[in-house]
C-alpha cells in the first residue's frame, strides 16, 4: 500500500486519458524523485493553465486572451472557417503554414455510443457564426460573413458522421461546406498527420 499522499497522487494522475494505474504510479514516483523546484514548477504550471486559459468567445479555441490571436488577426480571411474537433488540431494545421483562414473548435465529435450528441459540442456557436454575423467579436477583419466551412474532423467513423451532420446544418445558411481530402489515413487522428499530408488534405478539399 502506498502512503496516503502518494495514493492520492496516483489516483489523480490515473484520471488523465491513456494513463493506467501502473503508469500513474511510475509518474508519481518520478515526481517524488524530482527536485522540490521541479515539482513546484509542475504544480504551478497546472495551476496557471487552469487560471489563465479560457475559451475564445469567437472560435471556441483555448486562449489566454479573448478573442484569440487568430480571430484578431486582420490578415486572415474571415470568410473561411476550418472546423476541427480539438484545439490540438488547430496547432497541427497551423504548422503547415499554408492555411490563412480562421477556425472553429467543436471540442469533440458526435459519438452516440458514448452519449455525445450535438448539444455536447460547440455546434450552436458554429451555426450562429455561419448565420451571417460578423467574422470576429471585436470587429477585426471587417463584417464579411462566413462563405466556406472546411470540415476538418478526423476521418474516423465519428469524424465522418460529424462532418456530414454539420454539412446538412450549414448548407441552408448559404455556407459552402467542404471536406478535407483523404490524404489523412482513414481512422487516423488529425494531430498525428505530417505537415505535407495535412496541407495537401486541405488544398484538396471537396464539396460535401
PLM region descriptions:
Residues 49-52, 64:
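Short metal-coordination and nucleic-acid-contact micro-motifs, chiefly zinc-binding Cys/His arrays
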Residues 56-59, 68-71:
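Short cysteine-rich clusters marking metal-coordination/redox-active sites
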Residues 2, 99-100, 127-150, 154-208:
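Long C-terminal interaction/binding lobes of large macromolecular proteins
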Residues 24, 72-153:
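Extended interfacial segments that mediate partner engagement and assembly in macromolecular machines
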Residues 63-65, 76:
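Short functional micro-motifs and their immediate structural scaffolds
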Residues 1-17:
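Extended, structured, electrostatic nucleic-acid-contact surfaces
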Amino acid at each position: 500500500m502506498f502512503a496516503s499522499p502518494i495514493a492520492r497522487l496516483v489516483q489523480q494522475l490515473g484520471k488523465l486519458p491513456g494513463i493506467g494505474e501502473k503508469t500513474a504510479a511510475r509518474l508519481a514516483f518520478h515526481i517524488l524523485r524530482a527536485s522540490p523546484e521541479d515539482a513546484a514548477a509542475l504544480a504551478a504550471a497546472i495551476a496557471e493553465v487552469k487560471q489563465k486559459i479560457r475559451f475564445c468567445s469567437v472560435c471556441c479555441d483555448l486562449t489566454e486572451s479573448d478573442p484569440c490571436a487568430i480571430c484578431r488577426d486582420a490578415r486572415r480571411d474571415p470568410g473561411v472557417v476550418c472546423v476541427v474537433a480539438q484545439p490540438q488540431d488547430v496547432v497541427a494545421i497551423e504548422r503547415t503554414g499554408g492555411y490563412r483562414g480562421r477556425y472553429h473548435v467543436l471540442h469533440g465529435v458526435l459519438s452516440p455510443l458514448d452519449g455525445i450528441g450535438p448539444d455536447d459540442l460547440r455546434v450552436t456557436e458554429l451555426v450562429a457564426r455561419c448565420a451571417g454575423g460578423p467574422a470576429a467579436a471585436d470587429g477585426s477583419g471587417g463584417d464579411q460573413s462566413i462563405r466556406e466551412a472546411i470540415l476538418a474532423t478526423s476521418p474516423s467513423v465519428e469524424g465522418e458522421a460529424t462532418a456530414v451532420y454539420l454539412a446538412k446544418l450549414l448548407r441552408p445558411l448559404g455556407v459552402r461546406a467542404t471536406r478535407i481530402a483523404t490524404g489523412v489515413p482513414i481512422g487516423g487522428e488529425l494531430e498525428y498527420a505530417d505537415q505535407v499530408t495535412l496541407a495537401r488534405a486541405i488544398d484538396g478539399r471537396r464539396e460535401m
